[in-house]
Amino acid sequence: MIYGVGTDICDVRRIRASLERHGERLAQKILSEAELATWKERSERWPDRGVRYLATRFSAKEAFSKAIGLGMRMPMTWRHCEISKAASGKPEIVLHGPLKDWFETRQLSVHVSVTDENEYAASFCVVEKNDF
C-alpha cells in the first residue's frame, strides 16, 4: 500500500551559489559521512559534477521527507538520510539513527529515482507500507 509520494526539483545554480557563499559547511550540513567523502572526491576531479551530486542528494532527501509526511522535522534530518546506490547503479535510501527506527517501526519501504541536467536536479520518491 502506498504510504506517501514526494517529488522535488532543485536549481543547481542555487546550490552552486550557496556553495560559493558557505563553502564545505553546506555539504557538511546536507550530506552523510559517506556522501561527503564521495562529494569531495567528485568535486576535486570535476567541480561541476560535485555541485550536481550535492543538488541530487538535496533533491532526493527533500522528496523523501515529503513522502514520509514529516518534511524536515525530527526524526528526519539531512544526515540521517543517505542516498546510496546498489551495485546495479540504482539509487537507494539508507537511513540512520532515530529516522531508521521511526521508519522501521512503521514497516515502511522506499523507492527513489534521481536525475540531473546542467541546471536542475529532480527526484521522485514512493514510500510503501509493508503488510507482512
UniProtKB/Swiss-Prot annotation:
SUPFAM superfamilies in UniProt: 4'-phosphopantetheinyl transferase (SSF56214)
Keywords: Cytoplasm, Fatty acid biosynthesis, Fatty acid metabolism, Lipid biosynthesis, Lipid metabolism, Magnesium, Metal-binding, Transferase
Keyword presence, Transferase: yes
Disulphide bonds in the chain: none
Enzyme category, top tier: transferase
Compartment(s): Cytoplasm
Biological processes per GO annotation: fatty acid biosynthetic process
Cofactor: Mg(2+)
A GO CC term assigned to this protein in UniProt: cytoplasm
Chain positions recorded as Mg(2+) binding sites: 8, 62
EC number: 2.7.8.7
GO MF, one annotated term: holo-[acyl-carrier-protein] synthase activity
Top-level taxon of the source organism: Bacteria
Signal peptide segment: none
Recorded catalytic activity of this chain's protein: apo-[ACP] + CoA = holo-[ACP] + adenosine 3',5'-bisphosphate + H(+)
InterPro entries attached to this UniProt entry: 4-PPantetheinyl_Trfase_dom, 4-PPantetheinyl_Trfase_dom_sf, ACPS, Ppantetheine-prot_Trfase_dom
Family per similarity comment: Belongs to the P-Pant transferase superfamily. AcpS family.
UniProt function note: Transfers the 4'-phosphopantetheine moiety from coenzyme A to a Ser of acyl-carrier-protein.
NCBIfam families the UniProt entry points to: acpS, pantethn_trn
Protein name in UniProt: Holo-[acyl-carrier-protein] synthase
Species name: Polaromonas sp. (strain JS666 / ATCC BAA-500)
